[in-house]
């Protein structure tokens, strides 16, 4: 955990960019020391905070940065579609490794641990709690429970075709309801991230467009293939 108070953490990330340093799974950059380097480079570039996946990656990154860290663990479970920090042990491990904010799946889906129990554990361990939601109803429920941050993270990722554009309406609606809003999900250009802040997001998380080199190179390579010469 950084030496910032909860209010200082929120003030630090307010109106700022959160760099999600999550390499492609099992790719050449999926190593804790590389994640830590990505995190440091992101802060040099102007990020206000970081989102780090995995306890080992968090352990490698925390000693190298003072900025707020949102931490998660991703798992693929046989009996639940929930992937983001599904177990209380994950929360315990992230808190011990230095997370300032712990994010959990906030969707209304079958899960091994209730949202209420996850929130209680996060706060007991002295961390701020973030809910990764997909709908306004989910976000409002998590706000009422006492989550400190509500994200649009899961919008478009709970079934069906994934949209191309971010869910601006969800960001607007969450803000209108009084949430501290993290815009997240498909904000893959500077203009889209800027728009998120302009429509009311308190901060915006960008991942693939910053730290997944395979994706970024692919965007360029695919576009070049369509060039008419």
UniProtKB/Swiss-Prot annotation:
UniProt family annotation: Belongs to the NanE family.
Pfam families assigned to the protein according to its UniProt record, in alphabetical order: NanE
InterPro entries for the chain: Aldolase_TIM (IPR013785), NanE (IPR007260), RibuloseP-bd_barrel (IPR011060)
Organism: Actinobacillus pleuropneumoniae serotype 5b (strain L20)
Entry protein name: Putative N-acetylmannosamine-6-phosphate 2-epimerase
A cellular component annotation (GO) from this entry: cytosol
Known pathway: Amino-sugar metabolism; N-acetylneuraminate degradation; D-fructose 6-phosphate from N-acetylneuraminate: step 3/5
EC number: 5.1.3.9
